């Protein structure tokens, strides 16, 4: 899977400890739905997704975004076993929800953008390396059931 050094794990954990999951989760999922509008088809029960402002202000988007980032917190607790940590979510997204696994990669990239906007100068290139490894590993773990 993905190998993070002890230093990379520390930088991920440190930054995550400062993360406002409620706020950032809604931002990340909202941005995914705005930037990649075809992903909206998986959220047809979320109500008004007709514009960027409607999406970013949608309470269901915010609530599900929080849920998504909370599961990312689980990844941080299980960086050495992402496949195991995401086995059930992989099965759910593959077998029941039929989500295109490419969307996991897109969400990971959006999360990195959210981290940059929230942490600015603290999100150094070295910190980004660690986070890119993590979001790539999470995307691979979530896509595991598809193979």
Swiss-Prot record:
Red blood cells. One of its GO terms (cellular component) is blood microparticle. Keywords: Heme, Iron, Metal-binding, Oxygen transport, Phosphoprotein, Transport. The modification Phosphoserine is found at residues 14, 51. GO terms for biological process: hydrogen peroxide catabolic process. Pfam families: Globin (PF00042). Residues 3-147 form the Globin domain. Heme b binds at residues 64, 93. GO terms for molecular function: haptoglobin binding; heme binding; hemoglobin alpha binding; metal ion binding; organic acid binding; oxygen binding; oxygen carrier activity; peroxidase activity. Belongs to the globin family. Heterotetramer of two alpha chains and two epsilon chains in early embryonic hemoglobin Gower-2; two zeta chains and two epsilon chains in early embryonic hemoglobin Gower-1. The epsilon chain is a beta-type chain of early mammalian embryonic hemoglobin. This is Hemoglobin subunit epsilon. It comes from Carlito syrichta (Philippine tarsier). The lineage of its organism: Eukaryota, Metazoa, Chordata, Craniata, Vertebrata. The gene is HBE1.
């Amino acid at each position: 899977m993905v190998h993070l050094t002890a230093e990379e794990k520390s930088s991920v954990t440190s930054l995550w400890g400062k993360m406002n999951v409620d706020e950032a989760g809604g931002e990340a999922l909202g941005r995914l739905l705005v930037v990649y509008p075809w992903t909206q088809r998986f959220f047809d029960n979320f109500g008004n997704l007709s514009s960027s402002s409607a999406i970013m202000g949608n309470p269901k988007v915010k609530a599900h975004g929080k849920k998504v980032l909370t599961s990312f917190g689980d990844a941080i607790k299980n960086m050495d076993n992402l496949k195991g940590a995401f086995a059930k979510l992989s099965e759910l997204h593959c077998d029941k929800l039929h989500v295109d696994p490419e969307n996991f990669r897109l969400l990971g990239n959006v999360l990195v953008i959210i981290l940059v906007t929230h942490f600015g100068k603290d999100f150094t290139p070295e910190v980004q390396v660690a986070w890119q490894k993590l979001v790539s590993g999470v995307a691979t773990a979530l896509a595991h059931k598809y193979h």
